[in-house]
A protein has these predicted regions:
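Basic, Lys/Arg- and aromatic-enriched nucleic-acid-binding interface segment
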Residues: 1-2, 6-8, 16, 52-55, ...
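Short, charged phosphate-coordinating catalytic segments
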Residues: 1-26, 118
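Mobile genetic element proteins and their domesticated derivatives, centered on retroelements
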Residues: 5, 22, 49, 85, ...
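C-terminal secondary-structure termini that scaffold catalytic or DNA-interacting sites
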Residues: 17, 30-32, 36-44, 51-53, ...
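Active-site/catalytic core of tyrosine-dependent DNA strand-transfer enzymes
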Residues: 17, 25-28, 50-95
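Catalytic-site neighborhood detector that most strongly recognizes the C-terminal catalytic loop/helix
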Residues: 26, 54, 117, 124-149
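Short basic/aromatic active-site micro-motif
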Residues: 76-79, 95-114
Length: 163
């Protein structure tokens, strides 16, 4: 979530163990920056990072001036973040996307890679696995893939039914 990203501090990122601790959320109200609790209780979580992202974050933190471990790593507003993404998409000649679209794409990718809805819900901070199930429509071939895997399993065990 945008607010979770924009609330991150150096203290929240452990590049050695490749984790991010999500414990707060950023918002702006009446021109003032506010750091509060994440959207739901399940939003508070520790997310495992792939190596490439841990390395990118490490390089970013080293590039920045010596950040106070309590200062936001990305000290800009949601508007600025979305506007930057919009501009980048335009320059790249691709369809405009929102930050939330990246979250949606991440869930879709994890579903396609075969991760369980429960594991994805934990990673995304979904309050309920039912929220994760909203993405199921994105993969209409999953039913066919399941049937093919079951066929392969039965054939490998020599238990296929022949006529």
């Amino acid at each position: 979530r945008e607010g979770e990203l924009l609330a991150l501090t150096a203290k929240d990122i452990d590049t050695k163990n490749r984790t991010i601790s999500v414990t707060k959320s950023y918002s702006r109200l009446n021109g003032r920056d506010i750091i509060g609790k994440p959207k739901t209780k399940k939003s508070e979580r520790v997310i495992a990072l792939p190596r490439f992202l841990a390395q990118e974050l490490q390089e970013y933190m080293e590039m920045e001036r010596e950040p106070n471990e309590n200062e936001r790593l990305f000290p800009f507003t949601k508007y600025a973040l979305n506007n930057t993404l919009k501009t980048a998409a335009k320059l790249a000649g691709v369809k405009e996307i929102r930050v939330h679209d990246l979250r949606h794409s991440h869930v879709s990718l994890l579903i396609n890679l075969g991760f369980t809805a429960v594991a994805i819900a934990d990673r995304m901070g979904h309050e309920s696995v039912h929220i994760t199930y909203r993405y199921a429509h994105l993969f209409p071939n999953q039913q066919r893939n399941m049937a093919d895997v079951l066929d392969a399993l039965m054939n490998a065990r020599g238990e296929g039914h022949e006529r």
